[in-house]
Design a protein with these regions (language model features):
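Positively charged, small/polar-rich N-terminal and surface patches that mediate targeting and assembly
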Residues: 1-100
Length: 100
């Protein structure tokens, strides 16, 4: 079994940004993504996913290091001043690297 190194970029953000972020990450080279609901507590207080305007979602992208870096840089520049957003990148090993 051959494993290949990739990056897992996770972005927790306001649900209102979903469409714009999906367009951005695809334009920046992401081949796909996974979106799930998210709730929790952070510097902007408690976020509860039950009320749509106040909901957060988590967007995950498996990609190469250059793509992860490009996405993080672009999203930080475009959104971090006006929206709640947390991004982090971790190392992962994947099967079928051509998918990512």
């Amino acid at each position: 079994m051959e494993l290949t190194a990739r990056k897992l970029l996770t972005i927790a953000h306001e649900r209102a940004l979903e469409g714009a972020l999906v367009r951005d990450i695809e334009n920046l080279g992401a081949h796909g993504y996974t979106i799930t609901g998210a709730r929790g507590k952070g510097s902007h207080g408690i976020r509860d996913a039950t009320w749509a305007p106040d909901a957060n979602i988590r967007l995950e992208v498996l990609c190469g290091a250059d793509t992860a870096r490009a996405i993080c840089t672009a999203l930080r520049e475009r959104y971090s001043d006006n929206y709640s957003m947390v991004m982090y990148v971790g190392d992962v090993d994947v099967l079928r690297p051509e998918k990512f």
